[in-house]
C-alpha cells in the first residue's frame, strides 16, 4: 500500500490537480510513506534473496532513498542555505506591489543576479519563493517585490511590519544574467524583477550590453513596477528599453513578436504568454520554470 500511496502522490504532483497550499501539506507525508514501503520491502528480503538484483537494488538504492527521507523529515533540506534576518524597510511601489528589504545576520553565498530565494516571514512556517530584485555587495541586504496575487501575498501587504523576523533559504534558480550577446529580454507584470536584478548588477560592475533590448509589459504605467528605475539602468548599461502599456497600445501581439525575433529571448511572466511565445519563436526561449511540482 505504501508504494501505491507514493505513486498517487507522484501522479497528483505531475498533474497539479491540487492547490499548492494543500498539496504542500500532503507532500510532507511522502517521506513517511516511502519509509513504510521500504521497511515492508526489507521484510521480504529473506524470500527475495539479498544477493539477487532485486534484493541489492532494494537494499542499496532503497537505503539511499531512506537516508534522504530521514534527512527531509528532520528538516535538514536546504539548512546550509538558510539565513536569519529581519525586515528593514517596506516601500509600496503601487497599489498592489510592495517592495521589501531584508537585512541578514550572515551573507548569502553563491548568489547570481536573477536568482530567487524562499522567504518565511514572521515565523509563519510558509516559505514562498521571490526573485531577489537586488542584493547588496556584501550579500547581507536583500530586496524583493511582492505583488498581491493570492492569500499569502495579501497577508504580507496587510500585516508585515518593519522588524519582523525572516528566514531566507537560497539562492536558487538558473535564470541568471547571461553572457554578453544580442538578445531580447521580456518581463511582464511582476516578472520584470529578474531583469531589474540583471541591470543593477551590470551597472554596479560598469558593464554594458549593446544589442540587447528590454521589453516591459504592463496594463498601465502605474502598474509597471520599477519602470522609471529601469529606464535609467538601461541607459547606463547600453540596453534599449521599451515599455508596452496595454492601456495605450492594446495587448502585445506575442505571435508577431515571436515570428520576427531572431535573437534569443529571455522571458519572465505569466505562463500563457510564455506558451504563446514558445509556439511562434524560431529563436531560443529561456525562462525560469517557476513551478515546484
Question: In which residue ranges do the predicted regions lie?
Answer:
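Ferredoxin-reductase
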Residues: 77-167, 183, 210-213, 217-220, ...
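FNR/FR-type flavoprotein reductase catalytic core
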Residues: 1-78, 148-293
Amino acid at each position: 500500500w505504501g508504494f501505491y500511496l507514493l505513486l498517487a502522490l507522484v501522479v497528483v504532483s505531475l498533474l497539479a490537480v491540487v492547490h499548492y497550499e494543500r498539496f504542500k501539506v500532503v507532500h510532507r507525508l511522502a517521506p513517511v510513506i516511502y519509509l513504510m514501503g521500504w521497511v515492508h520491502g526489507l521484510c521480504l528480503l529473506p524470500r527475495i534473496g539479498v544477493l539477487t538484483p532485486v534484493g541489492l537494488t532494494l537494499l542499496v538504492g532503497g537505503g539511499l532513498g531512506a537516508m534522504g527521507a530521514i534527512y527531509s523529515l528532520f528538516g535538514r533540506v536546504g539548512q546550509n542555505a538558510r539565513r536569519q534576518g529581519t525586515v528593514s524597510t517596506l516601500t509600496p511601489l503601487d497599489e498592489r506591489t510592495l517592495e521589501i528589504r531584508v537585512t541578514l545576520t550572515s551573507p548569502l553565498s553563491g548568489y547570481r543576479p536573477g536568482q530567487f530565494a524562499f522567504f518565511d516571514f514572521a515565523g509563519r512556517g510558509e516559505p514562498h519563493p521571490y526573485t531577489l530584485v537586488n542584493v547588496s555587495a556584501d550579500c547581507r541586504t536583500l530586496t524583493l517585490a511582492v505583488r498581491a496575487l493570492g492569500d499569502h501575498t495579501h497577508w504580507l501587504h496587510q500585516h508585515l511590519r518593519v522588524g519582523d523576523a525572516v528566514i531566507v533559504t537560497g539562492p536558487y534558480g538558473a535564470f541568471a544574467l547571461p553572457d554578453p550577446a544580442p538578445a531580447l529580454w521580456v518581463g511582464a507584470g511582476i516578472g520584470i524583477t529578474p531583469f531589474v536584478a540583471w541591470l543593477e548588477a551590470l551597472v554596479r560592475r560598469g558593464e554594458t550590453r549593446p544589442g540587447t533590448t528590454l521589453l516591459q509589459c504592463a496594463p498601465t504605467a502605474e502598474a509597471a513596477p520599477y519602470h522609471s528605475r529601469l529606464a535609467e539602468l538601461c541607459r547606463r548599461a547600453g540596453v534599449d528599453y521599451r515599455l508596452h502599456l496595454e492601456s495605450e497600445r492594446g495587448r502585445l501581439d506575442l505571435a508577431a513578436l515571436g515570428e520576427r525575433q531572431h535573437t534569443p529571448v529571455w522571458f519572465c511572466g505569466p505562463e500563457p504568454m510564455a506558451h504563446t511565445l514558445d509556439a511562434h519563436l524560431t529563436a531560443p526561449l529561456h525562462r525560469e520554470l517557476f513551478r515546484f511540482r
